[in-house]
């Protein structure tokens, strides 16, 4: 009860975006209340929360949705909550109970001092050869353009879906061409939108589905650094020019029934291509091409950023300008991994530079006898 009262107050105080409120609400409804929701706050002890973290570590993703227990398939039951998710539960509880102490509801916070460790497994990415081969094999024009834009600009899926024709400038940068990232598309809960207000919302799309509790929106980017200009490649520039011709042809087929959404990525009837459709198209392509390492669509952003760091010689600030990370440190920490091929090359360069021909051979240090 306390958490459900605390959330809206925090939302109003900190001007949360709808997606932030929705994410935190989901954490409370699905990862906290089902397990300790019946306990009195005053009786909560650190070991109760340690038990919660341990239980969550054995819990499948999606076990609860909107507070209701879900029936999961055998395959779904094998995908457990990550350490990062459990860490977020701890972070939310720590903040909430700090307020409970400040408001005089509790004398002391029951949240353990030590937080659960975040997941540290490396992200699955493609190397440059896999990126090139995958793009060449994609026949769906919507998917091809979405992936091409994502690889060139290291985009988030909401950013690629949020592009409009006005964001494309073929003459910029002395004819090189650019596209601008300044908004993002997302489907959010109507209830979350009602709680947070519409300050960050640029546009709501019409939804013909009756009784839907979600709405597709175009919103401001995540942070100021997320607004950025990306330089085109010649291949992408040519594809975009052909795409604009395709949009004109689609509208000419039946102008009266064509519903121009105003977005760059559109279905043949003019409606916007939302992020979930891009993900589904990518998943369908992956199922049909099992030879490629399996990655999520967001993995294309990581693949692109990793490759750009490699070819730039580690120019973090230049790559940050493309990826839109909030800070250089965040970029470095996110992409601290390096591909095996690059590590081999680095080892070879070290060997060639350190053991130069004619240099004094490196001798092993003599082993001294231990004192008696």
Regions found by a protein language model. Name each.
Residues 100-110, 170-173, 187-193, 242-256, ...:
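Proline-centered turn/helix-capping motifs that create local helix->coil transitions or kinks
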Residues 1-101, 261-264, 279, 283:
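Short, Lys/Arg-enriched alpha-helical recognition elements, typified by the DNA-recognition helix
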Residues 61-65, 136, 140-141, 153, ...:
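Short, basic (Lys/Arg/His-rich) helix/loop patches that form interaction surfaces
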Residues 4, 43-46, 58, 107, ...:
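Phosphate-coordinating loops and pocket residues in cytosolic domains that bind phosphorylated ligands
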Residues 62-83, 87-91, 102-163, 173-176, ...:
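Basic, Lys/Arg- and aromatic-enriched nucleic-acid-binding interface segment
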Residues 167-173, 183-227, 236, 269, ...:
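C-terminal secondary-structure termini that scaffold catalytic or DNA-interacting sites
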Residues 117-118, 125, 176, 183-187, ...:
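Catalytic-site neighborhood detector that most strongly recognizes the C-terminal catalytic loop/helix
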Residues 32, 49, 93-96, 104, ...:
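Conserved hydrophobic/aromatic pocket- or pore-lining residues that grip, position, or stack substrates
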């Amino acid at each position: 009860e306390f958490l459900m009262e605390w959330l809206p107050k925090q939302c109003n105080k900190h001007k949360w975006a709808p997606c932030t409120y929705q994410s935190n609400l989901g954490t409370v409804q699905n990862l906290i209340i089902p397990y300790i929701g019946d306990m009195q706050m005053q009786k909560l002890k650190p070991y109760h929360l340690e038990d919660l973290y341990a239980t969550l570590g054995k819990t499948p993703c999606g076990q609860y949705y909107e507070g209701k227990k879900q029936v999961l398939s055998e395959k779904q039951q094998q995908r457990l909550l990550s350490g990062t998710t459990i860490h977020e539960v701890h972070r939310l509880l720590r903040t909430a109970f700090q307020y409970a102490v400040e408001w005089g509801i509790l004398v002391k916070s029951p949240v353990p001092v030590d937080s659960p460790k975040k997941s540290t497994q490396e992200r699955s990415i493609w190397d440059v050869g896999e990126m090139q081969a995958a793009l060449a094999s994609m026949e769906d024009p919507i998917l091809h353009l979405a992936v091409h834009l994502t690889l060139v600009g290291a985009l988030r899926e909401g950013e690629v879906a949020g592009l409009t024709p006005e964001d494309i400038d073929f003459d910029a940068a002395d004819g090189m061409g650019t596209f601008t990232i300044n908004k993002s598309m997302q489907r959010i809960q109507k209830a979350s939108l009602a709680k947070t207000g519409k300050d960050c919302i640029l546009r709501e799309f019409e939804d013909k589905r009756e009784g839907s509790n979600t709405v597709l929106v175009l919103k401001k980017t995540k942070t100021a650094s997320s607004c950025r200009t990306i330089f085109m490649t010649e291949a992408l520039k040519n594809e975009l020019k052909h795409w604009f011709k395709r949009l004109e042809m689609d509208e000419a087929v039946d102008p009266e029934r064509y519903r121009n959404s105003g977005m760059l990525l559109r279905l043949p009837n003019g409606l916007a291509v939302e992020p979930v459709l891009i993900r589904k198209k990518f998943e369908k392509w992956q199922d049909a091409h099992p030879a490629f390492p399996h990655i999520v669509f967001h993995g294309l952003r990581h693949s692109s950023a990793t490759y750009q760091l490699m070819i730039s010689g580690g120019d973090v600030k230049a790559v940050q300008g493309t990826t839109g990370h909030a800070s250089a440190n965040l970029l470095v920490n996110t992409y601290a991994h390096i591909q095996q091929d690059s590590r081999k090359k680095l080892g070879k360069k070290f060997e060639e530079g350190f053991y130069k021909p004619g240099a004094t051979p490196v001798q092993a240090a003599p082993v001294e006898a231990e004192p008696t």
